[in-house]
């Protein structure tokens, strides 16, 4: 059974500059850490949750280690300066999945996300492999059953694989099938796709599903496509697979990208999403601390989470 644990206070440590001025604060001083999972106490806040699971990566023949990412990313976030929006972060702990029960873990995350959103929170989830996206996305669909939900994925991979069981490569096919079962439209956009990393069968599936696809080569000029997608939906779930970044910026993932989309371009693409007033849920997935020798990759990933919380409207 998937277990919930509060985040350790030892993760939220950093440099104390408060002697300089009252507003010389860092995230470890402004994030609220909860000892219980009770989102109803935190309306209008951002639920920071970890999904400590990489069973989907293992099933997808990837490099395991992403289960250790949530706490590594908390440590990287802790010492970053606290600015507007960061005081809304409430650490609601980790969902820890026992191997090999991926399906049970995804259901636990789905229920937790739905509960947070229905309580008036927003969710920022630290994965975990990209299997995180099915649990997270399903929770968003559950919470907004009467509204159109747009799924925006920044990723080198379409993750529309067809297999006999869930993996880190299947979450968006699973979400599409969930939408089919609920007789609702599947709104999915994937930015940063590597044609070299996706078979013709996956491209065909994306075309059949009417997926908005922007290749890595074209992301430097994709703001118009992002805006068009934002405009056509009521609510948005944003998921960032860190392998969308080039290997020289993000080596610490299961499948590093030879080309990728540079961090500055990723930030410019997600800014209008965060400021749209429609973003309800976001996650960072596939970070693997086993391949981060000096913590630099963790800081890259944490900067994305920091920026999302800062821009979130």
From Swiss-Prot:
Pathway: Amino-acid degradation; L-histidine degradation into L-glutamate; L-glutamate from N-formimidoyl-L-glutamate (hydrolase route): step 1/1. GO terms for biological process: L-histidine catabolic process to glutamate and formamide; L-histidine catabolic process to glutamate and formate; putrescine biosynthetic process from arginine, via agmatine. This is Formimidoylglutamase. Belongs to the arginase family. It comes from Salmonella paratyphi C (strain RKS4594). Mn(2+) 1 binds at residues 130, 155, 159, 241. It catalyses: N-formimidoyl-L-glutamate + H2O = formamide + L-glutamate. Its cofactor is Mn(2+). Keywords: Histidine metabolism, Hydrolase, Manganese, Metal-binding. It is an enzyme of class 3 (hydrolase). HAMAP family: Formimidoylglutam (MF_00737). It comes from the Bacteria. One of its GO terms (molecular function) is manganese ion binding. Its EC number is 3.5.3.8. The gene is hutG. Mn(2+) 2 binds at residues 155, 157, 241, 243. Catalyzes the conversion of N-formimidoyl-L-glutamate to L-glutamate and formamide. Binds 2 manganese ions per subunit. Pfam families: Arginase. The lineage of its organism: Bacteria, Pseudomonadati, Pseudomonadota, Gammaproteobacteria, Enterobacterales.
């Amino acid at each position: 059974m998937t277990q919930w644990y509060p985040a350790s206070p030892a993760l939220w440590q950093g440099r104390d500059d408060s002697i300089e001025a009252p507003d010389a604060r860092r995230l470890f001083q402004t994030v609220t850490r909860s000892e219980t999972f009770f989102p109803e106490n935190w309306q209008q806040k951002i639920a920071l949750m970890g999904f400590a699971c990489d069973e989907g990566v293992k099933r997808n023949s990837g490099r395991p280690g992403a289960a250790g990412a949530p706490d590594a990313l908390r440590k990287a976030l802790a010492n970053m300066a606290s600015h507007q929006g960061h005081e809304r972060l409430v650490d609601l702990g980790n969902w820890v999945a026992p191997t090999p029960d991926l399906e049970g873990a995804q259901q636990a995350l789905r229920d937790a996300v739905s509960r947070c959103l229905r309580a008036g929170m927003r969710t920022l989830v630290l994965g975990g492999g990209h299997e995180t996206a099915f649990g997270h996305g399903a929770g968003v669909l559950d919470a907004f059953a009467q509204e159109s939900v747009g799924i925006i994925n920044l990723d080198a991979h379409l993750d529309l694989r067809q297999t006999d069981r869930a993996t880190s490569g299947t979450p968006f096919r699973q979400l599409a099938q969930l939408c089919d079962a609920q007789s609702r439209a599947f709104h999915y956009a994937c930015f940063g796709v590597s044609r070299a990393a996706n078979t013709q069968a996956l491209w065909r599936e994306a075309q059949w599903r009417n997926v908005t696809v922007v290749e890595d080569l074209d992301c430097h000029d994709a703001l118009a496509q992002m805006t068009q997608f934002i405009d056509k939906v009521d609510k948005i779930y944003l998921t960032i697979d860190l392998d969308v970044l080039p290997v020289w910026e993000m080596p610490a993932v299961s499948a590093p990208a030879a080309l990728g989309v540079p961090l500055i371009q990723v930030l410019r693409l997600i800014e209008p999403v965060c400021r749209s007033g429609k973003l309800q849920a976001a996650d960072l997935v596939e970070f693997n601390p086993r391949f981060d020798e000096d913590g630099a990759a963790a800081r890259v990933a944490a900067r994305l989470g920091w920026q999302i919380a800062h821009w979130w409207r």
